[in-house]
Regions:
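HDAC/HDAC-like amidohydrolase catalytic core signature
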Residues: 1-247
Length: 247
């Protein structure tokens, strides 16, 4: 955090530690956050121990907007980042995190921005038009040892799958060149055409192809659930992605 002084009153603390005001804390929040992280860790352990090639961790609340010192965007702690660090400490020399949620994974980026052992790639709505607004631009490429290991693909409103998948193919090529030991996918179904708070135009059948392309990398893959707000469709879109990941 750039400011050295933490306010004493509660509204000030919320403004200091929260990147946005929509992420409320209530009875049961801490238990849910802890359980969500444990789901990601269980998935990471299953991958790291070689028990499975693909694991889906249905994490709620999500995590990719949370950094070391800020929460927000419905995220409190970063499940994907915790899983990546666990993999690093349990046999993986390099880990790649591919974030395909509609919103930029600003928290994941911040956590690994100065590291070369975790490659972070994010496909998302252009932050000029979408949350989190202040991060997710193409010129954010990492810092220090992490220079070149952060890759952002901001995309315009109304982007259809045939344009979106061009960015995915570029990201997949970068992952293949990086040659990680394991892959984490931060999956959000809010890229769907009828998602109420997003502006991409992916259709339900597109998620089959998305999963299949990622599967072609042949990497042990942990999928961690992030966003998705078209309530009637989030289930089928997630299932379609997971089916594609097994193809």
């Amino acid at each position: 955090m750039p400011a050295p002084h933490v306010p004493d009153f509660i509204d000030g603390k919320i403004g200091y530690y929260a990147l946005a005001g929509e992420t409320s804390i209530s009875e049961g929040t801490i238990e849910a956050v802890r359980a969500s992280a444990q789901v990601a860790l269980t998935g990471a352990d299953t991958i790291a121990s070689g028990q499975a090639q693909h694991i889906f961790s249905l994490c709620r609340p999500p995590g990719h907007h949370a950094s070391r010192d800020q929460y927000g965007g419905y995220c409190f702690i970063n499940n994907a980042a915790i899983a990546a660090q666990y993999m690093r400490e349990n046999g993986a020399a390099k880990v790649a995190i591919l974030d395909v949620d509609f919103h930029h994974g600003n928290g994941t980026q911040a956590i690994f921005y100065d590291r070369a052992d975790v490659l972070f790639l994010s496909l998302h709505g252009d932050p000029k038009h979408a949350f989190p607004h202040f991060l997710g631009y193409a010129d954010e490429v990492g810092h220090g040892k992490g220079d070149g290991y952060n890759i952002n693909y901001p995309m315009a409103p109304q982007t259809p799958y045939d344009k979106w998948v061009e960015a995915l193919d570029h990201a997949i090529a970068s992952i293949r060149s990086y040659a990680p030991d394991s892959l984490i996918v931060s999956f959000g179904a809010d890229t769907f055409e009828h998602d109420p708070i997003s502006f991409f135009k992916l259709k339900s059948d597109d998620y089959f192809d998305m999963g299949a392309r990622i599967n072609a990398l042949g990497l042990p893959t942990l999928t961690v659930m992030e966003g998705g707000y078209a309530v009637k469709d989030i289930g089928i879109n997630t299932v379609n992605f997971l089916i594609g990941l097994e193809r």
